[in-house]
Amino acid sequence: MSQIILASASPRRKELLEQIGAEFVVCPAKGEEIITEEEPSAVVMELSRQKAEEVASGVLTYNEQHAELVTPQDILVIGADTVVAYENQILGKPKDEEDARRMLSMLSGKTHSVYTGVTFVFIDKAGRTGEHCFYEKTDVSMYKLTEEEIDRYISSGDPMDKAGSYGIQGRFAIHIKGIHGDYNNVVGLPVARLYQELRKLGVDV
């Protein structure tokens, strides 16, 4: 069985991976996100790849520098990134409260899409690497929000670390009219698809 490394500081992704019984360590990527793509699906795969590759590179460097201390083993690094998309606009995490208000007003009473990209970087015992990348899309419909509801939600602080300025699994759940697709994908990690992709690649978690 491979040692699994989650290249994300998101507590929601950590919880989702724990739910499927995976044993892993958390090692968040710290590099600056560089976006060269425009389509939401391509953006999330690009960013998830950057995160996974950064952490995998660090693992390889450490193993080379401490070869006498490291027991060779297969390693799987998982990187993920989530964005909200509405009318060709990509919404990441809000920069400030005003940005969160702008996003929530935009999404109020509408249907938008949530994209999560996932990248696996495999490192075998000999230090050879391989990659596999995919994305999942879920459509989410919101009820119409009043300005008071938006202000109250923003004052809770909950939107500030979430793509699109809301968390479907928290207090904002009362404003969700419906979803089409994987609920966990909106939370931050499509674990069912992740598991199926690993199975196709012959990886046991």
UniProtKB/Swiss-Prot annotation:
Signal sequence region: none
Keywords: Cytoplasm, Hydrolase, Nucleotide metabolism
Positions of the record's site feature: Important for substrate specificity: 12, 82, 169
Localization annotation: Cytoplasm
Active site, UniProt feature: 81 (proton acceptor)
The keyword Cytoplasm is annotated on this UniProt entry: yes
Leading EC class: hydrolase
A cellular-component GO term for this protein: cytoplasm
Assigned EC number: 3.6.1.9
Cofactor(s) required, per the database record: a divalent metal cation
The keyword S-adenosyl-L-methionine is assigned to this record: no
Single GO molecular function: dTTP diphosphatase activity
Coarse class of the protein's main subcellular location: cytoplasm
Protein family: Belongs to the Maf family. YhdE subfamily.
Physiological role: Nucleoside triphosphate pyrophosphatase that hydrolyzes dTTP and UTP. May have a dual role in cell division arrest and in preventing the incorporation of modified nucleotides into cellular nucleic acids.
Name of the protein in its database record: dTTP/UTP pyrophosphatase
Organism: Agathobacter rectalis (strain ATCC 33656 / DSM 3377 / JCM 17463 / KCTC 5835 / VPI 0990) (Eubacterium rectale)
